[in-house]
Amino acid sequence: MAKPLKDGHIHIEGNGSNYYNENGDPSPFDQEFHNDSLRTEFWQMVHQTLSNNRFGVVDSIGFEVDGEKLFHFTKSEDFGYFRFLRSDPTGESYTGPDLVQIRKDLNTIFEDFEELKGLIIDVRLHRGGYPEFSFEVAGRFTDKKILGRFTQSRISGGAYDEFDSLKGHYVDPDQVYATSKFLKPIVLLTNEGVGSAGEVFVMAMDQMAHVTSVGTNTAGIFSFMYEFNLPNEWWCSLSNSRTLSPDQQLYEGTGIPPDIIVQNTRKDLASQSDPVVMKALEILNEQTQ
Protein backbone atom coordinates (compact mmCIF):
# COMPACT_ATOMS: atom_id res chain seq x y z
CA MET A 1 0.00 0.00 0.00
CA ALA A 2 2.68 2.52 1.02
CA LYS A 3 5.59 1.02 -0.92
CA PRO A 4 4.95 2.77 -4.28
CA LEU A 5 5.29 6.14 -2.53
CA LYS A 6 8.92 5.39 -1.59
CA ASP A 7 8.80 7.53 1.55
CA GLY A 8 9.86 6.22 4.96
CA HIS A 9 7.78 8.84 6.79
CA ILE A 10 4.46 7.60 5.35
CA HIS A 11 2.68 5.29 7.78
CA ILE A 12 -0.85 3.90 7.90
CA GLU A 13 -1.96 2.05 11.02
CA GLY A 14 -5.25 0.47 12.05
CA ASN A 15 -6.93 -2.79 13.11
CA GLY A 16 -3.59 -4.20 14.15
CA SER A 17 -2.00 -3.51 10.76
CA ASN A 18 0.93 -1.19 10.13
CA TYR A 19 1.75 -0.18 6.56
CA TYR A 20 4.92 1.73 5.92
CA ASN A 21 7.83 1.76 3.55
CA GLU A 22 11.48 2.68 3.92
CA ASN A 23 12.18 4.05 0.45
CA GLY A 24 11.42 1.03 -1.70
CA ASP A 25 13.34 -2.23 -1.85
CA PRO A 26 15.63 -3.37 0.98
CA SER A 27 18.97 -1.59 1.06
CA PRO A 28 22.20 -3.54 0.44
CA PHE A 29 22.81 -3.53 4.21
CA ASP A 30 19.30 -4.85 4.92
CA GLN A 31 19.80 -7.59 2.36
CA GLU A 32 23.06 -8.63 4.01
CA PHE A 33 21.89 -8.27 7.63
CA HIS A 34 18.19 -8.99 7.27
CA ASN A 35 17.22 -10.03 10.81
CA ASP A 36 17.89 -9.16 14.45
CA SER A 37 20.28 -12.08 14.90
CA LEU A 38 22.53 -10.95 12.05
CA ARG A 39 22.47 -7.37 13.30
CA THR A 40 23.50 -8.54 16.75
CA GLU A 41 26.38 -10.39 15.11
CA PHE A 42 27.20 -7.23 13.16
CA TRP A 43 27.69 -5.19 16.34
CA GLN A 44 29.66 -8.02 17.95
CA MET A 45 31.94 -7.94 14.90
CA VAL A 46 32.33 -4.15 15.26
CA HIS A 47 33.32 -4.58 18.90
CA GLN A 48 35.78 -7.35 18.01
CA THR A 49 37.37 -5.09 15.40
CA LEU A 50 37.83 -2.39 18.02
CA SER A 51 39.29 -4.92 20.46
CA ASN A 52 41.70 -6.17 17.80
CA ASN A 53 42.93 -2.60 17.45
CA ARG A 54 43.59 -2.12 21.16
CA PHE A 55 40.35 -0.44 22.14
CA GLY A 56 38.84 -1.28 25.49
CA VAL A 57 35.52 -3.00 26.10
CA VAL A 58 32.61 -0.92 24.77
CA ASP A 59 30.75 0.70 27.67
CA SER A 60 27.18 2.03 27.63
CA ILE A 61 25.40 4.76 29.61
CA GLY A 62 22.23 6.80 29.37
CA PHE A 63 18.50 6.24 29.09
CA GLU A 64 17.50 2.71 28.12
CA VAL A 65 14.85 1.92 25.48
CA ASP A 66 14.06 -1.64 24.36
CA GLY A 67 17.03 -2.92 26.32
CA GLU A 68 19.56 -0.58 24.72
CA LYS A 69 21.22 2.36 26.44
CA LEU A 70 21.59 5.66 24.62
CA PHE A 71 25.37 6.05 24.30
CA HIS A 72 28.14 3.50 23.61
CA PHE A 73 31.83 4.37 23.86
CA THR A 74 35.37 3.12 24.28
CA LYS A 75 38.91 4.27 23.51
CA SER A 76 42.40 3.15 22.62
CA GLU A 77 45.60 4.96 23.51
CA ASP A 78 45.09 7.40 20.62
CA PHE A 79 41.46 7.32 19.47
CA GLY A 80 37.93 7.29 20.82
CA TYR A 81 34.82 5.49 19.58
CA PHE A 82 31.33 6.92 20.21
CA ARG A 83 28.00 5.51 19.03
CA PHE A 84 24.38 6.58 19.41
CA LEU A 85 21.57 5.01 17.40
CA ARG A 86 18.57 7.16 18.25
CA SER A 87 17.68 10.81 18.77
CA ASP A 88 14.65 10.07 20.92
CA PRO A 89 16.71 9.49 24.06
CA THR A 90 13.87 8.34 26.34
CA GLY A 91 11.69 6.82 23.62
CA GLU A 92 9.28 9.73 24.11
CA SER A 93 9.44 13.52 24.25
CA TYR A 94 12.29 14.32 26.59
CA THR A 95 11.98 16.90 29.38
CA GLY A 96 14.30 19.46 30.94
CA PRO A 97 15.47 17.06 33.68
CA ASP A 98 16.10 14.41 31.00
CA LEU A 99 18.28 16.86 29.09
CA VAL A 100 20.27 17.63 32.23
CA GLN A 101 21.08 13.92 32.60
CA ILE A 102 21.89 13.57 28.89
CA ARG A 103 24.36 16.46 29.04
CA LYS A 104 25.92 14.97 32.16
CA ASP A 105 26.41 11.64 30.36
CA LEU A 106 27.92 13.34 27.30
CA ASN A 107 30.26 15.35 29.51
CA THR A 108 31.39 12.12 31.18
CA ILE A 109 32.24 10.58 27.81
CA PHE A 110 34.00 13.53 26.21
CA GLU A 111 35.96 14.59 29.26
CA ASP A 112 37.50 11.11 29.05
CA PHE A 113 38.31 11.72 25.36
CA GLU A 114 40.04 15.09 25.86
CA GLU A 115 43.61 13.85 25.45
CA LEU A 116 42.92 11.62 22.44
CA LYS A 117 44.14 12.41 18.93
CA GLY A 118 40.99 11.51 16.99
CA LEU A 119 37.48 10.12 17.21
CA ILE A 120 35.20 7.67 15.41
CA ILE A 121 31.48 8.49 15.60
CA ASP A 122 29.30 5.55 14.55
CA VAL A 123 25.68 6.29 13.60
CA ARG A 124 25.10 3.30 11.32
CA LEU A 125 21.48 2.13 11.80
CA HIS A 126 20.51 5.36 13.60
CA ARG A 127 16.71 5.16 13.63
CA GLY A 128 15.94 8.88 14.01
CA GLY A 129 14.04 10.87 16.61
CA TYR A 130 14.23 14.58 17.39
CA PRO A 131 16.37 16.85 15.19
CA GLU A 132 16.98 19.10 18.20
CA PHE A 133 18.69 16.22 19.98
CA SER A 134 20.89 15.55 16.95
CA PHE A 135 22.01 19.19 17.08
CA GLU A 136 22.57 18.84 20.84
CA VAL A 137 25.13 16.11 20.17
CA ALA A 138 26.63 17.86 17.12
CA GLY A 139 27.26 20.95 19.24
CA ARG A 140 30.01 19.01 21.01
CA PHE A 141 32.16 19.05 17.88
CA THR A 142 32.29 22.73 16.93
CA ASP A 143 33.39 25.92 18.67
CA LYS A 144 31.33 28.21 16.44
CA LYS A 145 27.69 28.48 15.43
CA ILE A 146 27.10 26.73 12.09
CA LEU A 147 24.18 26.34 9.70
CA GLY A 148 23.13 22.69 9.89
CA ARG A 149 20.22 22.57 7.43
CA PHE A 150 17.29 24.38 5.84
CA THR A 151 13.66 23.28 6.00
CA GLN A 152 10.59 24.27 4.01
CA SER A 153 6.97 23.33 4.76
CA ARG A 154 4.25 22.78 2.19
CA ILE A 155 1.83 25.68 1.82
CA SER A 156 -1.65 24.57 2.88
CA GLY A 157 -3.89 24.48 -0.17
CA GLY A 158 -0.96 25.18 -2.47
CA ALA A 159 0.35 23.23 -5.42
CA TYR A 160 2.35 20.03 -4.92
CA ASP A 161 5.68 21.80 -5.34
CA GLU A 162 4.70 24.97 -3.46
CA PHE A 163 6.65 25.53 -0.24
CA ASP A 164 7.15 28.43 2.14
CA SER A 165 10.48 30.24 2.49
CA LEU A 166 13.67 28.55 3.64
CA LYS A 167 14.16 28.33 7.40
CA GLY A 168 17.72 27.93 8.67
CA HIS A 169 18.52 25.64 11.62
CA TYR A 170 21.79 26.17 13.47
CA VAL A 171 24.11 24.11 15.63
CA ASP A 172 25.08 26.42 18.48
CA PRO A 173 27.86 25.14 20.76
CA ASP A 174 26.98 27.77 23.35
CA GLN A 175 23.59 26.11 23.87
CA VAL A 176 24.75 22.57 24.71
CA TYR A 177 26.58 23.38 27.98
CA ALA A 178 29.47 21.06 27.21
CA THR A 179 32.39 20.88 29.61
CA SER A 180 34.55 19.54 26.77
CA LYS A 181 34.49 19.98 22.98
CA PHE A 182 36.16 17.59 20.55
CA LEU A 183 37.68 19.60 17.68
CA LYS A 184 40.33 17.13 16.50
CA PRO A 185 39.96 14.80 13.48
CA ILE A 186 36.68 12.87 13.41
CA VAL A 187 35.54 10.05 11.14
CA LEU A 188 31.76 9.62 10.91
CA LEU A 189 30.42 6.15 9.99
CA THR A 190 27.16 6.05 8.01
CA ASN A 191 24.99 3.60 6.09
CA GLU A 192 21.54 3.17 4.58
CA GLY A 193 20.07 2.53 8.02
CA VAL A 194 20.59 6.15 9.09
CA GLY A 195 17.26 7.94 8.76
CA SER A 196 15.42 11.11 9.72
CA ALA A 197 17.05 12.84 12.71
CA GLY A 198 20.09 10.63 12.23
CA GLU A 199 20.51 12.22 8.82
CA VAL A 200 20.07 15.66 10.37
CA PHE A 201 23.10 14.81 12.51
CA VAL A 202 25.09 13.64 9.48
CA MET A 203 24.17 16.77 7.52
CA ALA A 204 25.31 19.01 10.38
CA MET A 205 28.55 17.11 10.87
CA ASP A 206 29.28 17.37 7.14
CA GLN A 207 29.62 21.14 7.61
CA MET A 208 32.67 20.69 9.87
CA ALA A 209 36.09 20.72 8.21
CA HIS A 210 37.61 18.22 10.67
CA VAL A 211 35.00 15.53 9.89
CA THR A 212 35.36 12.82 7.22
CA SER A 213 32.44 10.47 6.52
CA VAL A 214 32.92 6.80 5.62
CA GLY A 215 30.39 4.11 4.70
CA THR A 216 27.40 4.35 2.36
CA ASN A 217 24.58 6.80 1.63
CA THR A 218 22.06 7.46 4.37
CA ALA A 219 18.39 6.49 3.92
CA GLY A 220 17.07 9.77 2.50
CA ILE A 221 14.13 10.20 4.91
CA PHE A 222 14.03 13.82 6.04
CA SER A 223 10.54 15.31 6.01
CA PHE A 224 8.46 16.38 8.98
CA MET A 225 5.48 14.08 9.55
CA TYR A 226 1.91 15.41 9.23
CA GLU A 227 -0.26 13.11 11.36
CA PHE A 228 -4.04 12.71 11.17
CA ASN A 229 -6.87 10.15 11.41
CA LEU A 230 -8.63 8.82 8.32
CA PRO A 231 -12.48 8.66 8.24
CA ASN A 232 -12.30 5.02 9.38
CA GLU A 233 -10.21 6.15 12.41
CA TRP A 234 -7.01 4.64 11.06
CA TRP A 235 -3.93 6.75 11.86
CA CYS A 236 -1.87 8.14 8.99
CA SER A 237 1.28 10.22 8.58
CA LEU A 238 2.41 12.02 5.44
CA SER A 239 5.49 14.03 4.56
CA ASN A 240 4.70 17.76 4.47
CA SER A 241 8.11 19.42 4.27
CA ARG A 242 11.53 19.13 2.75
CA THR A 243 15.05 19.46 4.10
CA LEU A 244 17.94 21.02 2.21
CA SER A 245 21.62 21.06 3.06
CA PRO A 246 23.31 24.41 3.76
CA ASP A 247 24.30 24.52 0.08
CA GLN A 248 20.61 23.87 -0.75
CA GLN A 249 20.94 20.30 -2.00
CA LEU A 250 18.01 17.88 -1.63
CA TYR A 251 18.84 14.37 -0.42
CA GLU A 252 15.28 13.07 0.04
CA GLY A 253 15.11 9.56 -1.39
CA THR A 254 18.81 9.38 -2.27
CA GLY A 255 20.46 9.96 1.10
CA ILE A 256 23.61 11.85 1.98
CA PRO A 257 26.69 10.33 0.32
CA PRO A 258 29.82 9.72 2.39
CA ASP A 259 33.21 11.14 1.52
CA ILE A 260 34.57 7.60 1.17
CA ILE A 261 32.39 4.61 0.23
CA VAL A 262 32.95 1.36 2.14
CA GLN A 263 30.25 -1.35 2.23
CA ASN A 264 29.62 -3.92 4.96
CA THR A 265 28.74 -7.50 3.92
CA ARG A 266 28.11 -10.76 5.75
CA LYS A 267 31.68 -11.77 4.90
CA ASP A 268 32.74 -9.30 7.60
CA LEU A 269 31.19 -11.62 10.19
CA ALA A 270 33.44 -14.48 9.11
CA SER A 271 36.56 -12.34 9.16
CA GLN A 272 35.51 -10.57 12.38
CA SER A 273 36.84 -7.37 10.84
CA ASP A 274 34.77 -4.29 10.04
CA PRO A 275 36.16 -2.62 6.88
CA VAL A 276 34.38 0.63 7.73
CA VAL A 277 36.04 0.90 11.14
CA MET A 278 39.36 -0.14 9.61
CA LYS A 279 39.11 2.63 7.00
CA ALA A 280 38.27 5.10 9.79
CA LEU A 281 41.39 4.07 11.71
CA GLU A 282 43.49 4.39 8.55
CA ILE A 283 42.21 7.95 8.03
CA LEU A 284 42.78 8.94 11.65
CA ASN A 285 46.30 7.56 11.61
CA GLU A 286 47.06 9.56 8.45
CA GLN A 287 45.54 12.76 9.82
CA THR A 288 47.22 12.60 13.23
CA GLN A 289 50.78 11.63 12.29
Question: Where in the sequence are the language-model features?
Answer:
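Flexible, low-complexity junctional segments that flank or bridge functional domains
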Residues: 1-154, 166, 227-229, 235, ...
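C-terminal "post-core" interaction segments
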Residues: 81, 85-89, 114, 118, ...
